[in-house]
């Protein structure tokens, strides 16, 4: 039976959302195939093995037995407790359920790579690019995928100066949208209708991140989402959903606080499958596959698109490399259960790990010997 490490929580503004995703993932494994090893990382960065992940109350109290404190060793073994009585668990595969910084941004993927643990999620490069909205936009432009007009800033003064300059050419008029570069779940995202709101949004946003993305705000648009993951037989694409928002963009409250259900994107009002033309469906699918392949992605990735009803143009908004609930609900009409998806992800992670293991990472040289000889002379 394979030991599956599920990492969640973490030092991130999306800490609580991560817990909800982990609960859903852990509840969906085939217990006859896998031994699930849930590890909670608290807001101080401490790791704990969790015996009953379904109990949300314990996370509210944040009370965990020090005996369950654990550490991941370089050999891929999880050590629980201290001393001679510490428990050792050899990890076979890992699922990262950590949204936002210190998890979804590639940091955890990098750690698992160093410890030679196969993970089902995107690697360091694709994770870090997708997490940074500014880098992601630049990459999209480089591969020919359309994005909404934007500029980026690192200070309030720069934000005011850049806006004044952009306003002169008529491209950036209110309303505008301000987004922290590396946050998800719509945290810190503000629609600004005037200069005062804009300045305040920039001040608040720079308390959450060191750089901001400023976008032209569309006023007549629809949002469309599609998820993709890879298997040994090729890419699997979900049906397309159309989220329905009461505001100008889908807020954190609508995603996670609606009726207290806490199911994230699965809980929002939406049209599913989206009632769109075959041409638009094909365009969304084409771009989703292209981005997935160009960024060399792995695991489940949800792509969020925006369609401008006025200009009849489709734009990529963002890619979520660790989407809430692993976007399992988008595959239901494909007759793919969450359990089946998890099996697929593990199977592909195994193949991917073997392929990467065969890559030569080191080689012998005479550099040190020659350097040593030169010193002796």
Locate predicted features.
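Short beta-strand-to-turn element immediately C-terminal to the catalytic PLP-Schiff-base lysine
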Residues: 153, 189-194, 228-231, 308, ...
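A short glycine-rich, hydrophobically flanked beta-strand micro-motif that places a catalytic Asp/Glu
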Residues: 37-39, 212-216, 224-225, 296-310
